[in-house]
């Protein structure tokens, strides 16, 4: 069977990119593929990895391109040759800088799996260079949505791009979300681009009107202290629960009522797909083509103008006050989530390996 390698920034991170990469790798391993992870940082995965999958960690995070570029590239090349890989899947365009050189003159299929939106501005220079390297060196570029695929094609005039959605493997076992839980949920790294400061300002308006409701934010990150201080300054700390990153996110989906996504940028957010599977209506900022694909306005939730606090308040308020509307949107979320089942998505991956 084919030997597949996933080259990833940090296998130990608890983000959606890591979770979905592990989900796909696990599914391939279960179907007989010989799968390995090569990680620049971390050697202990946060999410469960199939026992048949090998993990090779360089322990190079944080790295400096000036100091570490050639050592990381050299190590990657050595591992690719040692493992006799047929295909290397690069998870995130920011690390294309290493794989583009590491695979020179090696007869290996080279695939970029881009999880970030085409217009994401973080680490701009590295990501721009990564795009050009992907177009010139990769056999395939995988985007998460058709809209992102179109953006790549319009910019680079290339036909080696395919869209494959993120698959969901997290399904409800016992119970679904319900309005009576009186909980608004948001899950993600506590980073500035996740927009949790906007969510707290939204909640400040709603908390006064619905004192028996609460907001749960599940995740860890560098903005945690700032967000807790903001909650205190907004006088909402008693109704906001900050919960550290966890493997048992299912518990929070099934015990909540509405999922809220205040992000400034996203790819195709796995947390939204998972929330939909548990019957959570979604209220989100329209921050990317991926979010627009998942949230059909007034069907399974509300798509709000970017950073428009008033619109987000209105969407949440409508769901809280209308049990019939809530049930309609909850059912629609569950139905739409079925398009992202792992069985369907993994066949698309097998088609390009």
Swiss-Prot record:
UniProt subcellular location: Membrane
Keyword Membrane listed: yes
Enzyme category, top tier: transferase
Gene Ontology annotations for the cellular component aspect, listed alphabetically: membrane
InterPro entries given in the database record: Glyco_trans_1 (IPR001296), Glyco_trans_4-like_N (IPR028098)
Name assigned to this protein: Uncharacterized glycosyltransferase HI_1698
GO function terms (MF aspect): glycosyltransferase activity
Family: Belongs to the glycosyltransferase group 1 family. Glycosyltransferase 4 subfamily.
Source taxonomy: Bacteria, Pseudomonadati, Pseudomonadota, Gammaproteobacteria, Pasteurellales
PANTHER family registered for this protein in UniProt: GLYCOSYLTRANSFERASE (PTHR12526), TEICHURONIC ACID BIOSYNTHESIS GLYCOSYLTRANSFERASE TUAH-RELATED (PTHR12526:SF629)
Keyword line: Glycosyltransferase, Membrane, Transferase, Transmembrane, Transmembrane helix
């Amino acid at each position: 069977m084919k030997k597949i390698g996933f080259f990833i920034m940090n296998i130990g991170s608890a983000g959606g990119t890591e979770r979905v990469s592990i989900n796909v790798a696990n599914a391939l391993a279960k179907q007989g593929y010989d799968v390995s992870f090569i990680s620049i940082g971390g050697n202990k995965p946060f999410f469960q990895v199939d026992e048949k999958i090998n993990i090779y960690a360089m322990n190079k995070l944080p790295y400096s391109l000036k100091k570490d570029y050639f050592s990381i590239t050299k190590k990657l090349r050595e591992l690719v040759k040692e493992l006799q890989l047929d295909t290397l899947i690069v998870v995130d365009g920011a690390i294309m800088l290493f794989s583009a050189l590491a695979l020179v003159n090696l007869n290996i299929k080279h695939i970029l799996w881009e999880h970030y939106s085409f217009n994401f501005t973080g680490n701009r220079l590295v990501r721009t260079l990564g795009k050009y390297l992907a177009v010139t060196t990769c056999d395939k570029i995988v985007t998460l949505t058709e809209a992102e695929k179109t953006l790549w094609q319009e910019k680079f005039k290339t036909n080696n791009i395919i869209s494959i959605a993120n698959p969901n493997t997290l399904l409800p076992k016992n119970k679904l979300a319900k309005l009576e839980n009186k909980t608004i949920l948001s899950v993600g790294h506590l980073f500035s681009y996740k927009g949790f400061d906007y969510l707290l300002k939204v909640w400040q308006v709603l908390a006064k009107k619905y004192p028996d409701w609460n907001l749960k934010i599940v995740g860890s990150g560098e903005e945690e202290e700032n967000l807790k201080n903001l909650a205190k300054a907004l006088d909402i700390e008693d109704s906001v629960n900050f919960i550290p990153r966890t493997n048992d996110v299912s518990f929070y989906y099934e015990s909540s009522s509405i999922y809220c996504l205040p992000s400034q940028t996203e790819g195709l957010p796995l947390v939204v797909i998972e929330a939909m599977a548990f019957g959570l209506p979604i209220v989100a900022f329209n921050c990317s083509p991926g979010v627009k694909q998942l949230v059909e306005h007034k069907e399974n939730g509300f798509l709000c103008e970017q950073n428009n606090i008033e619109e987000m308040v209105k969407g949440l308020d409508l769901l809280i006050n209308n049990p019939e509307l809530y049930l309609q949107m909850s059912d629609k979320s569950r139905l739409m989530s079925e398009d992202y089942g792992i069985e369907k998505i993994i066949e698309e991956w097998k088609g390009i390996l």
